[in-house]
Amino acid sequence: MSVVPPNRSQTGWPRGVNQFGNKYIQQTKPLTLERTINLYPLTNYTFGTKEPLYEKDSSVAARFQRMREEFDKIGMRRTVEGVLIVHEHRLPHVLLLQLGTTFFKLPGGELNPGEDEVEGLKRLMTEILGRQDGVLQDWVIDDCIGNWWRPNFEPPQYPYIPAHITKPKEHKKLFLVQLQEKALFAVPKNYKLVAAPLFELYDNAPGYGPIISSLPQLLSRFNFIYN
């Protein structure tokens, strides 16, 4: 190892150890914090049924027509969806609503104008999965795990706003909903609530669409505790 003599000029290369001064600050805390989420077995949860819950629009074309009309009146649509996770044999599973044989979606929906995102998601979760006996469900919502934008009145959505888009037509936010140790869910009769393992969702946009199939990556930052 070479050593710079004490009388040598410090203008050449390599320079002394003080070249960068305080440019690089010593990190006193880790750059990332470990976020721990408790998961409970699917068998801890009870699933009942309630009256059917129908979509506002009868077709995809009708949905985009209503979106266009509302955009002219109130601007961009805001949508929130909840990601509920359980485990089976220490493998994380996401609860999905299944309509028919091939359509899956996360519980959630449209926010009212000016409605708070978290409070709106709690309202929607109660409407979709809330129990019928009047006991209020305690939805714990702390983490936003994803943002998706719809640039036009068309099906494609992206996890970013395309560069040429100044007025997205819809903004969808995904939130992790932490479940209690035990709970009762009432599922609308026209839906099935299914538990899909992460390995089934991963890289499976043809089966579940781009948003649901991205959940394994979005959830990988959490440290799951299997109770």
UniProtKB/Swiss-Prot annotation:
GO CC term (a single one): nucleus
Span(s) of short sequence motif Nudix box: 109-130
Site location (Interaction with RNA): E55, R63
Protein induction: Up-regulated during spermatogenesis.
Localization in the cell: Nucleus; Cytoplasm
Keywords: Acetylation, Cytoplasm, Differentiation, Methylation, mRNA processing, Nucleus, Phosphoprotein, RNA-binding
Provenance organism: Mus musculus (Mouse)
Entry-linked SUPFAM superfamilies: Nudix
Omega-N-methylarginine found at: R15
Function field: Component of the cleavage factor Im (CFIm) complex that functions as an activator of the pre-mRNA 3'-end cleavage and polyadenylation processing required for the maturation of pre-mRNA into functional mRNAs. CFIm contributes to the recruitment of multiprotein complexes on specific sequences on the pre-mRNA 3'-end, so called cleavage and polyadenylation signals (pA signals). Most pre-mRNAs contain multiple pA signals, resulting in alternative cleavage and polyadenylation (APA) producing mRNAs with variable 3'-end formation.
Modification(s) after translation: Acetylated mainly by p300/CBP, recruited to the complex by CPSF6. Acetylation decreases interaction with PAPAO. Deacetylated by the class I/II HDACs, HDAC1, HDAC3 and HDAC10, and by the class III HDACs, SIRT1 and SIRT2.
Residue span of region Interaction with RNA: 102-104
Protein name (record): Cleavage and polyadenylation specificity factor subunit 5
Record note on quaternary structure: Homodimer (via N- and C-terminus); binds RNA as homodimer. Component of the cleavage factor Im (CFIm) complex which is a heterotetramer composed of two subunits of NUDT21/CPSF5 and two subunits of CPSF6 or CPSF7 or a heterodimer of CPSF6 and CPSF7. The cleavage factor Im (CFIm) complex associates with the CPSF and CSTF complexes to promote the assembly of the core mRNA 3'-processing machinery. Interacts with CPSF6 (via the RRM domain); this interaction is direct and enhances binding to RNA. Interacts with CPSF7. Interacts with FIP1L1; this interaction occurs in a RNA sequence-specific manner.
Positions of the UniProt region annotated as Necessary for RNA-binding: 2-147
One Pfam family in the UniProt entry: NUDIX_2
Modified residues (N-acetylserine): S2
PANTHER family for this protein: PRE-MRNA CLEAVAGE FACTOR IM, 25KD SUBUNIT (PTHR13047)
